[in-house]
Amino acid sequence: MAESHGEAKGTASAHTEAEGGHGFPPFQKETFPSQIVSLVITFVALYVIVSRLALPKVGGVIDARQKAIDGDLAEAQRLNDESEAAMKAYESELAAARARAQAIGAETREKLAASSDAERKALEDSLAAKLAAAEKSIATTRATAMSNVRGIAADAASAIVQQLTGKAPAGKTVEAAVDASLKGTA
């Protein structure tokens, strides 16, 4: 194991040194100016390639994305404005519908009140007419009954007097007594 470690150490130094024992070329001071020139040329070439080819493509993609974003925002604003306008129209239509409903309700209440007043008046008139007819009928019935009562009372009084006295009283005397009794002047 010690041997393999020594071999590894020998191969490591072999990789860092050139065949002539000069070491790793990028670390040699003699090649620094040429390496720096190569580095500058490489970076200039890379800059030109990136600035001429890659940056315009990336810029185009960024511009396209920005235009798409702006378009989407404009579309969203337009749709928002449309929805707000539709909401305002809906609210105004709803308010108008409520006003119409209230007007229809008030009109219906007025019609129903007028109709019920007319029906009530007609019913009152009908009841008043029926009451007048009933009162007239009662008065007629009373007059008829009273005339019958007078005759019945006269006959009853005559029969009572005859029972008590044994003699039939005069018809005119009995009728005068019944008339006085019916009028309340006994």
UniProtKB/Swiss-Prot annotation:
Any Pfam family: ATP-synt_B
Cellular localisation: Cell inner membrane
InterPro entries: ATP_synth_b/b'su_bac/chlpt, ATP_synthase_B_chain
Molecular functions (GO terms): proton-transporting ATP synthase activity, rotational mechanism; proton-transporting ATPase activity, rotational mechanism
CDD domains listed in its UniProt record: ATP-synt_Fo_b
Region (Disordered): 1-26
GO cellular component term, pick one: proton-transporting ATP synthase complex
Keyword Repressor: no
Keywords for this protein: ATP synthesis, Cell inner membrane, Cell membrane, CF(0), Hydrogen ion transport, Ion transport, Membrane, Transmembrane, Transmembrane helix, Transport
Topology class, membrane: Single-pass membrane protein
Highest taxon in the source lineage: Bacteria
Residues that span the membrane, as ranges: 33-55
Protein purpose: F(1)F(0) ATP synthase produces ATP from ADP in the presence of a proton or sodium gradient. F-type ATPases consist of two structural domains, F(1) containing the extramembraneous catalytic core and F(0) containing the membrane proton channel, linked together by a central stalk and a peripheral stalk. During catalysis, ATP synthesis in the catalytic domain of F(1) is coupled via a rotary mechanism of the central stalk subunits to proton translocation.
Family in the record: Belongs to the ATPase B chain family.
Self-association and partners: F-type ATPases have 2 components, F(1) - the catalytic core - and F(0) - the membrane proton channel. F(1) has five subunits: alpha(3), beta(3), gamma(1), delta(1), epsilon(1). F(0) has three main subunits: a(1), b(2) and c(10-14). The alpha and beta chains form an alternating ring which encloses part of the gamma chain. F(1) is attached to F(0) by a central stalk formed by the gamma and epsilon chains, while a peripheral stalk is formed by the delta and b chains.
Protein name (Swiss-Prot/TrEMBL): ATP synthase subunit b 2
